[in-house]
UniProtKB/Swiss-Prot annotation:
Membrane in keyword set: yes
GO MF, one annotated term: G protein-coupled photoreceptor activity
Chain's role: Photoreceptor required for image-forming vision at low light intensity. Required for photoreceptor cell viability after birth. Light-induced isomerization of 11-cis to all-trans retinal triggers a conformational change that activates signaling via G-proteins. Subsequent receptor phosphorylation mediates displacement of the bound G-protein alpha subunit by arrestin and terminates signaling.
Alphabetical list of SUPFAM superfamilies matching this protein: Family A G protein-coupled receptor-like
Matching InterPro entries: GPCR_opsins (IPR050125), GPCR_Rhodpsn (IPR000276), GPCR_Rhodpsn_7TM (IPR017452), Opsin (IPR001760), Retinal_BS (IPR027430), Rhodopsin (IPR000732), Rhodopsin_N (IPR019477)
Protein name: Rhodopsin
GO biological process: absorption of visible light; G protein-coupled opsin signaling pathway; visual perception
Cellular component aspect of the GO annotation: membrane; photoreceptor disc membrane; plasma membrane
Region (Disordered): 332-352
S-palmitoyl cysteine lipid sites: 322-323
Domain of life according to the entry: Eukaryota
Length: 352
C-alpha cells in the first residue's frame, strides 16, 4: 500500500519513514509545502468573499421584489440556499483548517464539514436536475396542458433536499464515512478505502450511479431535447426574429450550463473514481486536492448562470443596490422571463 490508513483517516503517503501523523492532531507539511496550504486558504477566502454576497443578495432581492416570487424562482432560491450551506458550513471550516495545515476540528468536525459540504453540493446538483426537467416540460411539451405552478415548485424543492439527504446522511449513520482528503484540510466521502466495516464499497457505487451518472444523464437528455425543439420551431418560422433569438439564447444557456457542470464536477468525480478503482495506487495528495477544491467553485458559478443572466432579476438587483433607482432605466416587467407562456419564444426559453 502506498498510503497510510488510520482508524478515521487515510493519508496518501507511505509511513515507511515514520513521519506520518494523524491529520486531526498535527500539521501535514510532509505532504506539501506550507505555502500550498496558504494558497488553499487564500482560495477558500476568495470563494467566501464572492460566494456569500452573491447568494445572499439573491435571497434578499427576491424578498424585496414580489415580482420575482414566481414558482420557478423557488428552485433558484433553493439553489442559492444550497450554495450558502456550502459557504457557511464548509468553506469557512476549510479556510481555517488550511491556515493551520491540518484538520484541527477533529473527527466530529470532519463529519460536520463533510456533511454540510456534501449536502449543499447535492442540493445544488438536484436543483439543476429539477430546472432541466422543468425546461424540458415547458418548452418541449410532452404534456400539452402542463403549467409549472407553485405546488410543482414546492415539490421540486422538497425533492432536492430528500435526494441530497440520501447522499449526505448515510455516512453519519454508518454507511461509509467522512474522512480528510487530499492535503487533509477538507473532508469528503471515503473514496480511498473499501472499509468493509462500514460497507464503503457499496455506498461509493451507489453514490456514483444515483448521485452523479443519473443526474448527468437527465440534464443532457432534457437540454438536448430542448435545443432540438427550438431548432425545429426556428426551421418552421424562418422569418420569425423572436424565434431566432430564442434559439440563440437557449443554445447559449445550454452550453454554459452543461460546460460549467462538467468543469466543476467531472474532474472531481473522475479522480475519485480512479482512486476508488485503483485501491493502493500511488498518487500524491495534490492529485485529489485540486479537483476537490475546484468543485467548490460551483457555489459561484450557479448564481451567475441561473440568476444574474435573468434580465428581470438583474434589473431588480441593480435597483436594490442603487437604493430604489435603476441607472440603466430598463423596464423590469418587459424584460422579465415568463416561463408559463405556451409558445416557443424568447421569454419562455430564456434563462429563468
Amino acid at each position: 500500500m502506498n498510503g497510510t490508513e488510520g482508524p478515521d483517516f487515510y493519508i496518501p503517503f507511505s509511513n515507511k519513514t515514520g513521519v506520518v501523523r494523524s491529520p486531526f492532531e498535527y500539521p501535514q507539511y510532509y505532504l506539501a509545502e506550507p505555502w500550498k496550504y496558504s494558497a488553499l486558504a487564500a482560495y477558500m477566502f476568495m470563494l467566501i468573499i464572492l460566494g456569500f454576497p452573491i447568494n445572499f443578495l439573491t435571497l434578499y432581492v427576491t424578498v424585496q421584489h414580489k415580482k420575482l416570487r414566481s414558482p420557478l424562482n423557488y428552485i433558484l432560491l433553493n439553489l442559492a440556499v444550497a450554495d450558502l450551506f456550502m459557504v457557511l458550513g464548509g468553506f469557512t471550516t476549510t479556510l481555517y483548517t488550511s491556515m493551520n495545515g491540518y484538520f484541527v476540528f477533529g473527527v466530529t468536525g470532519c463529519y460536520f464539514e463533510g456533511f454540510f459540504a456534501t449536502l449543499g453540493g447535492e442540493v445544488a446538483l438536484w436543483c439543476l436536475v429539477v430546472l432541466a426537467i422543468e425546461r424540458y416540460i415547458v418548452v418541449c411539451k410532452p404534456m400539452s396542458n402542463f403549467r409549472f405552478g407553485e405546488n410543482h415548485a414546492i415539490m421540486g424543492v422538497v425533492f432536492t433536499w430528500i435526494m441530497a439527504l440520501t447522499c449526505a446522511a448515510p455516512p453519519l449513520v454508518g454507511w461509509s464515512r467522512y474522512i480528510p482528503e487530499g492535503m487533509q484540510c477538507s473532508c469528503g466521502v471515503d473514496y480511498y478505502t473499501l472499509k468493509p466495516e462500514v460497507n464503503n464499497e457499496s455506498f461509493v457505487i451507489y453514490m456514483f450511479v444515483v448521485h452523479f451518472a443519473i443526474p448527468l444523464a437527465v440534464i443532457f437528455f432534457c437540454y438536448g431535447r430542448l435545443v432540438c425543439t427550438v431548432k425545429e420551431a426556428a426551421a418552421q418560422q424562418q422569418e420569425s426574429a423572436t424565434t431566432q433569438k430564442a434559439e440563440k439564447e437557449v443554445t447559449r444557456m445550454v452550453i454554459i450550463m452543461v460546460v460549467s457542470f462538467l468543469i466543476c464536477w467531472v474532474p472531481y468525480a473522475s479522480v475519485a473514481f480512479y482512486i476508488f478503482s485503483n485501491q493502493g495506487s500511488d498518487f500524491g495528495p495534490v492529485f485529489m486536492t485540486i479537483p476537490a477544491f475546484f468543485a467548490k467553485s460551483s457555489a459561484i458559478y450557479n448564481p451567475v448562470i441561473y440568476i444574474v443572466m435573468n434580465k428581470q432579476f438583474r434589473n431588480c438587483m441593480i435597483t436594490t443596490l442603487c437604493c430604489g433607482k435603476n441607472p440603466l432605466g430598463d423596464d423590469e416587467t418587459a424584460t422579465g422571463s415568463k416561463t408559463e407562456t405556451s409558445s416557443v419564444s424568447t421569454s419562455q426559453v430564456s434563462p429563468a
